[in-house]
């Protein structure tokens, strides 16, 4: 029996060797036809195509947004829109490219470390560039107002706007300078006790102004300053009070306007926007003429 087991083991070993030899000598049926080719560029994303499509899509979206804004924003586009509602238009004042360029340059200089840019070299169009088309339009406004104010009860002119940044201070200050150039005595009162900036425009002190006078802290001789560059007198707004409307309702405001009416050929009062606060309505009770400044496309369509 032991001999049989030895014979069987020998047969298994022989069979294993035969299989190993057969496996080593077997020829496979797989062969390489072409070597693999590597692609140096990515298949996706296609950057050039995406950039072109993105540019075209962005262009369409931008044009659509501009058209939608133009259609939804209904503002005053022409004087005829106001005249159709019985509102008299005294002048149309174009934007001054000269002033706009220098204003943008000064805003850049505000970030400079040089303090002089904050208080000096502020352009005043009526004096620095009197031949500008905007100044010529204000001269036409002066002529129109001269005839319009001939039958009014006093020579006090209130200039206001419908909304902030309507250009009322530009119109009022330029008008004051233009009228002063015709040898008339003019007083400019900055009654915008919240955001008035005439002291920066005229480069005068704002320590003693209208708010101090109305509060009883200062007298008239202390708050009236002369703006030599423009040739007229100025009352700045003073320090910002906590109750502007209440100050303007005091008798001292009425007394100031009555005194100014007797001592000046024209009194120009620059007030806050009439749709924002009630200050303009308060001052309007004591003036003979009111002028509303409507900026192009900024006033909601009537």
Question: Where is each model-derived feature located?
Answer:
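Conserved helix-loop functional segments at active or binding sites
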Residues: 14-22, 143-151, 266
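Membrane-interface helix-start motif
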Residues: 38-51
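Soluble periplasmic/extracytoplasmic beta-strand elements of cell-envelope proteins
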Residues: 30-34, 90-92, 156-158, 233-236
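Residue-level signature of catalytic and energy-coupling elements of molecular machines
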Residues: 12, 32, 82, 141, ...
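Short boundary/hinge segments that flank catalytic cores
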Residues: 52-185, 191-211, 222, 241-245, ...
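Non-transmembrane alpha-helical coiled-coil
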Residues: 1-4, 8-35, 40, 79
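Conserved catalytic-core segment of NTP-binding enzymes
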Residues: 73-83, 203, 215, 225-228, ...
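Hydrophobic anchor at the start of a short beta-strand
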Residues: 89-90, 186, 267, 290
């Amino acid at each position: 029996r032991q001999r049989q087991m030895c014979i069987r083991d020998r047969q298994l070993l022989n069979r294993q060797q035969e299989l190993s030899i057969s496996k080593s000598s077997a020829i496979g049926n797989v062969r390489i036809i072409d070597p693999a080719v590597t692609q140096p560029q990515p298949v996706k994303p296609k950057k050039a195509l995406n950039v072109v499509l993105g540019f075209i899509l962005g262009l369409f979206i931008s044009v659509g947004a501009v058209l939608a804004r133009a259609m939804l924003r209904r503002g005053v586009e022409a004087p005829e829109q106001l005249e159709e509602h019985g509102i008299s238009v005294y002048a149309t004042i174009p934007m001054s490219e000269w002033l706009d360029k220098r204003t943008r340059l000064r805003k850049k200089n505000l970030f400079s470390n040089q303090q002089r840019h904050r208080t000096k070299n502020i352009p005043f169009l009526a004096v620095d560039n009197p031949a500008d088309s905007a100044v010529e339009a204000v001269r036409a406004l002066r002529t129109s107002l001269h005839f319009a104010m001939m039958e009014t009860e006093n020579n006090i002119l209130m200039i206001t706007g419908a909304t902030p940044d309507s250009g009322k201070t530009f119109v009022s200050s330029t008008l004051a300078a233009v009228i002063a150039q015709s040898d008339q005595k003019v007083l400019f009162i900055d009654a915008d006790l919240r955001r008035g900036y005439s002291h920066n425009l005229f480069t005068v002190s704002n320590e003693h102004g209208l708010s101090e006078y109305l509060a009883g802290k200062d007298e008239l001789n202390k708050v009236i300053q002369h703006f030599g560059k423009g040739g007229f007198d100025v009352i700045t707004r003073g320090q910002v009070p906590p109750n502007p409307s209440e100050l303007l309702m005091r008798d001292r405001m009425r007394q100031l306007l009555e005194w100014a009416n007797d001592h000046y050929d024209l009194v120009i009062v620059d007030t806050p926007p009439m749709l924002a606060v009630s200050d303009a309505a308060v001052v309007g009770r004591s003036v003979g003429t009111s002028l509303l400044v409507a900026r192009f496309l900024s006033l909601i369509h009537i």
